[in-house]
């Protein structure tokens, strides 16, 4: 069953917010009226995950300019997120919120949980200001994602959201610069 055009299920989780308050709670109420990206990854202290999170950190300011809040999500605790971010040069520059899904609520609701392992699949969800999933992508364990492509998808989703009678064809972003 597709999750496209489905409203996200209410949630409340603990989180680590680097460089600010350290530990916070985040719920569905916190994202109302905002564009959000939920960026699921299997685990902290791994190999592909820090490359993706660092790439996302490089784009964080650009996403903020679009009014998009980034949430990385794994089934690790918020304490583990903090320890990893503070001990890894690769992800030291992260400033977006790292959600702890140690109770598996988000992974279950977004249908990305690998129950036998207690880990989330590598998946990305773009959620509009009404809490509706506009796009998602899931890849196998060894395939990293590209923040530049995610940025293009977010811009396309925002464009279609604001212009419901229009579409975004392939290479849409590069076409608008011609």
Each language-model region and where it sits:
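Chalcogenol-based redox active-site neighborhoods
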Residues: 1-176
